[in-house]
Amino acid sequence: MIPMTYLFVLCPLLFAAVAWGIKNRLRPLVLLAAALIHLLSTLWVTVTPQSPADGGWLWLDPLGRIVLFCISVLFTICAFYAVGYLRYYNKRSNRFLCVCMLVCLSAMTLVSMAQHLGLFWVAMETTTLTMAPLIYFYRNARSIEATWNYIIICSVGIALAFLGLMFLSYSTHLAH
C-alpha cells in the first residue's frame, strides 16, 4: 500500500497528466478539483498523527504540516481565480499553465515533506523551474524578457543553494 505522503506528491502529478490530455475548457476544472482534493487531504492529514517511521524520507513534521496547509490554501485560492481568468482569457491554450501549476503543487508538497536535504533541494528547484512557463503565458516580448530574467536570477539561486547544501553535507560528515 502506498503511504499517504507519497499520494500527496503523486496526486497533483496524476491531475497534471489528465490536464495535459483534455480540452482547453475543462482544464481549469481539473485544476480546481486537484486543489480541492489537495486541500481536503491536507486538512485530514493535519489532524492525523504520523510517526517519522511511516515515511522515511517523506513525512510531515509539525512545521511541514503548517507549510503544507499554507501551500494548499494558497493554491486553492489561485485555482478558483484561474477558473474565471482562463474562461475570460481563452485566446490561447491553457495546457502549459494548468500542467505547470499542478506540477508546481506537487513539488511544493514535496518540499514541505522532504526529510532529506538532496530531495528538498531537487523539489525546491522544481518549483522554481515550473514557474518559468507561467511567466511566459502571454507569449510576447515583455513576457519572454521577464522569463529570461527569472531563469537567470533563479539559476544563481539554484547554484548557491547547491553550494550551501554541499558545505552542509561536508560539515555533517566532519562531525561524525
Predicted regions and their residues:
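Alpha-helical multi-pass transmembrane bundles of energy-transducing inner-membrane proteins
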Residues: 96-103, 109-176
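Generic beta-strand or strand-like secondary-structure segments
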Residues: 72-75, 105-109
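Transmembrane helix-loop-helix hairpins at membrane boundaries of multipass inner-membrane proteins
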Residues: 1-100
